[in-house]
Swiss-Prot record:
GO BP, sorted A to Z: cell wall organization; polysaccharide catabolic process
Keyword set includes Membrane: no
Name of the molecule in the record: Glucan 1,3-beta-glucosidase
Family to which the UniProt record says this protein belongs: Belongs to the glycosyl hydrolase 5 (cellulase A) family.
Length: 40
């Protein structure tokens, strides 16, 4: 068997911030802007 199978290794791919994912922000939290365009 290959080393990956022999050692029971796996891969988890996280696409929560990928283009076209659930939301348009880089991370899960929504960024809010004040009246001057500054992130709050």
């Amino acid at each position: 068997a290959t080393p990956i199978l022999r050692n029971h290794l796996g891969v988890i791919i996280d696409l929560h911030a990928a283009p076209g994912s659930q939301n348009p922000w880089e991370h899960y939290a929504k960024v809010q802007m004040d009246v001057y365009g500054q992130a709050t």
